[in-house]
Amino acid sequence: MGCLTDSPIFVSAEVSSLLEMKFYKVDTNYLNELRQIDRRVPFNKEFVGKTKKTRPYIGIMLSIEGIDYLVPLTSNKGKRTSYVNMPIFDKNNEKIAYLLINNMIPVPEQYRSAINMNGILMTDPLYYDLLMNEINYLRPNKDSIKKRCKDVRAVKVKSEHRIAITEATANYCLDLLELEKIYNSKK
Protein backbone atom coordinates (compact mmCIF):
# COMPACT_ATOMS: atom_id res chain seq x y z
CA MET A 1 0.00 0.00 0.00
CA GLY A 2 2.76 2.44 0.90
CA CYS A 3 4.99 3.35 3.77
CA LEU A 4 2.77 5.98 5.37
CA THR A 5 1.02 3.46 7.64
CA ASP A 6 -0.20 -0.11 7.78
CA SER A 7 -3.81 1.10 7.80
CA PRO A 8 -5.33 1.09 4.31
CA ILE A 9 -8.09 3.43 5.48
CA PHE A 10 -5.55 6.09 6.43
CA VAL A 11 -3.67 5.73 3.16
CA SER A 12 -6.89 5.87 1.15
CA ALA A 13 -8.03 9.02 2.94
CA GLU A 14 -4.58 10.57 2.53
CA VAL A 15 -4.46 9.81 -1.19
CA SER A 16 -8.00 11.06 -1.63
CA SER A 17 -7.28 14.42 -0.08
CA LEU A 18 -4.10 14.83 -2.14
CA LEU A 19 -5.62 14.10 -5.54
CA GLU A 20 -9.13 15.45 -5.23
CA MET A 21 -10.28 18.73 -6.73
CA LYS A 22 -7.21 19.33 -8.88
CA PHE A 23 -7.11 19.22 -12.68
CA TYR A 24 -5.76 16.13 -14.40
CA LYS A 25 -5.39 14.83 -17.93
CA VAL A 26 -5.62 11.20 -19.04
CA ASP A 27 -3.29 9.11 -21.19
CA THR A 28 -4.59 8.80 -24.77
CA ASN A 29 -3.90 5.06 -24.99
CA TYR A 30 -5.86 4.44 -21.78
CA LEU A 31 -8.80 6.45 -23.13
CA ASN A 32 -8.65 4.41 -26.34
CA GLU A 33 -8.78 1.20 -24.31
CA LEU A 34 -11.80 2.43 -22.36
CA ARG A 35 -13.48 3.46 -25.60
CA GLN A 36 -13.36 -0.17 -26.74
CA ILE A 37 -15.73 -0.89 -23.82
CA ASP A 38 -17.91 2.22 -24.16
CA ARG A 39 -17.66 4.20 -27.40
CA ARG A 40 -18.90 7.34 -25.61
CA VAL A 41 -15.61 7.78 -23.72
CA PRO A 42 -14.35 11.12 -25.09
CA PHE A 43 -11.12 11.60 -27.03
CA ASN A 44 -8.08 13.68 -26.22
CA LYS A 45 -8.18 16.26 -28.99
CA GLU A 46 -4.88 16.68 -30.77
CA PHE A 47 -3.96 19.86 -32.66
CA VAL A 48 -7.21 21.80 -32.36
CA GLY A 49 -7.91 25.11 -34.06
CA LYS A 50 -5.76 27.58 -35.96
CA THR A 51 -2.96 27.46 -33.40
CA LYS A 52 -2.77 23.66 -33.58
CA LYS A 53 -2.80 23.39 -29.78
CA THR A 54 -3.77 20.12 -28.15
CA ARG A 55 -6.85 20.05 -25.99
CA PRO A 56 -6.57 17.13 -23.59
CA TYR A 57 -9.52 15.54 -21.88
CA ILE A 58 -9.24 17.15 -18.44
CA GLY A 59 -11.22 17.03 -15.26
CA ILE A 60 -11.08 16.78 -11.52
CA MET A 61 -10.21 13.60 -9.64
CA LEU A 62 -12.45 12.15 -6.95
CA SER A 63 -12.01 8.91 -5.03
CA ILE A 64 -15.23 6.93 -4.65
CA GLU A 65 -15.14 3.69 -2.66
CA GLY A 66 -11.45 3.21 -3.44
CA ILE A 67 -11.81 3.91 -7.18
CA ASP A 68 -10.14 7.07 -8.55
CA TYR A 69 -12.47 8.79 -11.00
CA LEU A 70 -11.79 11.64 -13.39
CA VAL A 71 -14.89 13.81 -13.79
CA PRO A 72 -14.37 15.76 -17.02
CA LEU A 73 -15.03 19.37 -17.88
CA THR A 74 -16.43 20.67 -21.11
CA SER A 75 -17.10 24.08 -22.59
CA ASN A 76 -20.32 25.97 -22.11
CA LYS A 77 -21.61 25.11 -25.59
CA GLY A 78 -24.91 23.39 -26.23
CA LYS A 79 -25.24 21.53 -22.95
CA ARG A 80 -28.35 21.17 -20.91
CA THR A 81 -28.24 21.23 -17.14
CA SER A 82 -29.20 18.01 -15.37
CA TYR A 83 -28.17 15.98 -12.35
CA VAL A 84 -25.26 14.55 -14.36
CA ASN A 85 -24.37 17.73 -16.35
CA MET A 86 -23.49 20.27 -13.68
CA PRO A 87 -23.01 23.89 -14.77
CA ILE A 88 -19.97 25.80 -13.52
CA PHE A 89 -20.27 29.53 -12.87
CA ASP A 90 -17.73 32.31 -12.52
CA LYS A 91 -17.72 34.92 -9.76
CA ASN A 92 -20.24 37.00 -11.75
CA ASN A 93 -22.63 34.03 -11.90
CA GLU A 94 -22.02 33.57 -15.64
CA LYS A 95 -22.11 29.97 -16.85
CA ILE A 96 -18.58 29.15 -18.09
CA ALA A 97 -18.43 25.35 -18.36
CA TYR A 98 -19.98 22.04 -17.36
CA LEU A 99 -18.82 19.17 -15.21
CA LEU A 100 -19.86 15.97 -17.01
CA ILE A 101 -20.64 13.52 -14.25
CA ASN A 102 -22.23 11.26 -16.87
CA ASN A 103 -18.77 10.90 -18.48
CA MET A 104 -16.74 10.20 -15.35
CA ILE A 105 -14.16 7.46 -15.85
CA PRO A 106 -12.01 5.39 -13.50
CA VAL A 107 -8.33 6.26 -14.01
CA PRO A 108 -5.41 4.48 -12.29
CA GLU A 109 -2.54 6.66 -11.12
CA GLN A 110 -0.14 5.68 -13.92
CA TYR A 111 -2.61 6.87 -16.60
CA ARG A 112 -3.21 10.38 -15.29
CA SER A 113 -1.07 13.43 -14.77
CA ALA A 114 -1.73 16.70 -12.99
CA ILE A 115 -2.18 19.74 -15.19
CA ASN A 116 0.78 22.13 -14.94
CA MET A 117 -1.09 25.30 -14.03
CA ASN A 118 2.11 27.40 -13.96
CA GLY A 119 2.89 26.27 -17.51
CA ILE A 120 -0.61 27.23 -18.64
CA LEU A 121 -0.28 30.62 -16.92
CA MET A 122 2.91 31.28 -18.91
CA THR A 123 1.62 30.06 -22.29
CA ASP A 124 -2.12 30.79 -22.23
CA PRO A 125 -3.18 33.26 -19.50
CA LEU A 126 -6.80 33.38 -20.68
CA TYR A 127 -7.15 29.60 -20.42
CA TYR A 128 -5.46 29.75 -17.01
CA ASP A 129 -8.06 32.31 -15.86
CA LEU A 130 -10.87 30.06 -17.12
CA LEU A 131 -9.46 27.03 -15.29
CA MET A 132 -9.00 29.05 -12.09
CA ASN A 133 -12.60 30.28 -12.29
CA GLU A 134 -13.73 26.68 -12.75
CA ILE A 135 -11.74 25.26 -9.84
CA ASN A 136 -12.78 28.18 -7.61
CA TYR A 137 -16.40 27.18 -8.26
CA LEU A 138 -15.84 23.43 -7.96
CA ARG A 139 -13.89 23.29 -4.69
CA PRO A 140 -16.63 24.78 -2.46
CA ASN A 141 -19.14 22.45 -4.18
CA LYS A 142 -17.06 19.30 -3.64
CA ASP A 143 -19.59 17.59 -1.36
CA SER A 144 -22.45 18.09 -3.82
CA ILE A 145 -20.28 16.91 -6.73
CA LYS A 146 -19.13 13.85 -4.82
CA LYS A 147 -22.73 12.96 -3.86
CA ARG A 148 -23.79 13.09 -7.51
CA CYS A 149 -20.82 10.94 -8.52
CA LYS A 150 -21.58 8.41 -5.77
CA ASP A 151 -25.21 8.29 -6.91
CA VAL A 152 -24.22 7.63 -10.53
CA ARG A 153 -21.78 4.92 -9.48
CA ALA A 154 -24.39 3.30 -7.19
CA VAL A 155 -26.85 3.10 -10.08
CA LYS A 156 -24.36 2.00 -12.75
CA VAL A 157 -22.16 -0.40 -10.73
CA LYS A 158 -24.41 -1.67 -7.95
CA SER A 159 -27.80 -1.40 -9.73
CA GLU A 160 -29.16 0.63 -6.82
CA HIS A 161 -32.05 3.06 -7.19
CA ARG A 162 -31.56 6.81 -6.74
CA ILE A 163 -34.49 9.22 -7.00
CA ALA A 164 -32.40 11.84 -8.84
CA ILE A 165 -31.37 9.40 -11.58
CA THR A 166 -34.06 8.25 -13.98
CA GLU A 167 -33.60 5.30 -16.31
CA ALA A 168 -32.94 7.72 -19.20
CA THR A 169 -30.31 9.54 -17.14
CA ALA A 170 -28.67 6.25 -16.15
CA ASN A 171 -28.52 5.21 -19.82
CA TYR A 172 -26.87 8.57 -20.62
CA CYS A 173 -23.99 7.71 -18.25
CA LEU A 174 -20.98 5.60 -19.21
CA ASP A 175 -20.86 1.87 -18.41
CA LEU A 176 -18.94 2.20 -15.14
CA LEU A 177 -19.27 -1.48 -14.24
CA GLU A 178 -17.30 -2.52 -17.33
CA LEU A 179 -14.90 0.44 -17.19
CA GLU A 180 -14.01 -0.43 -13.59
CA LYS A 181 -12.94 -3.89 -14.78
CA ILE A 182 -10.28 -2.23 -16.96
CA TYR A 183 -9.30 0.03 -14.05
CA ASN A 184 -8.92 -2.92 -11.68
CA SER A 185 -6.85 -4.87 -14.22
CA LYS A 186 -4.39 -1.94 -14.41
CA LYS A 187 -3.86 -1.39 -10.67
Task: Report residues per predicted region.
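Residues at the C-termini of beta-strands that transition into short coil/loop
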Residues: 27, 74, 108
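Low-complexity, polar-biased intrinsically disordered regions enriched in Pro/Ser/Thr/Gly
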Residues: 35-50, 81-92, 115-122
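C-terminal terminal-subdomain/extension
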Residues: 13-18, 92-187
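Residue-level detector of flexible, active-site-proximal loop/helix-junction positions
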Residues: 30, 77, 111
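Extracellular structured ligand-interaction cores
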Residues: 54-56, 101
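Compact nucleic-acid interaction/catalytic patches
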Residues: 48, 63-100
